[in-house]
Amino acid sequence: MPELTFLPATDEDVSAIYDLCKDLVNRYEDPASMDIDRVLLWILDKIQSNIAKYTCVREAGEKVAYYCLAESNDGWELDDLYVLAQHRNRGIGSEILERCISEASASIFLYVFTGNAGAIRLYERHGFSCVQQVSKTRQIMRRDG
């Protein structure tokens, strides 16, 4: 695998990150339990307001992934880790997680859709475990630092 390059995301990346997030919401969220349109507006605002905290991952100049690692009151939160579909199962997610683990000076937590078995397996391989089921469709996973 060619070397990955980690660069700050820019305003140009907002729509790509939003589209990846929207795809997961449409795939895993229960539309009967919430106003999906309102949730998607909140997500877009969150991404736009925090784009400076996001990282764009490139391989040989091509965008292959995005993530946001930010300090919070409860440790570090890993948010919106997305590896583009055509680049999955090649170790990119693992390399990003290893980088985040080494950058974080405390525990790391994240929210994951309960139905996203591939992501859950990836996180478990890197020492994360479920600490709370927050809804029928989402859980919090944590890795202590």
Residue ranges of model-derived segments:
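Conserved acetyl-CoA-binding loop-helix of GNAT-fold acetyltransferases
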Residues: V83, N89-S102, R121-R125
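Short, high-confidence coil segments that cap the C-terminus of an alpha-helix
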Residues: A52, S105-S107
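Conserved N-terminal entry element of GNAT/NAT acetyltransferase domains
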Residues: M1-E12, G145
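Structural preference for beta-strand elements that scaffold enzyme active sites
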Residues: G75, S107-F109
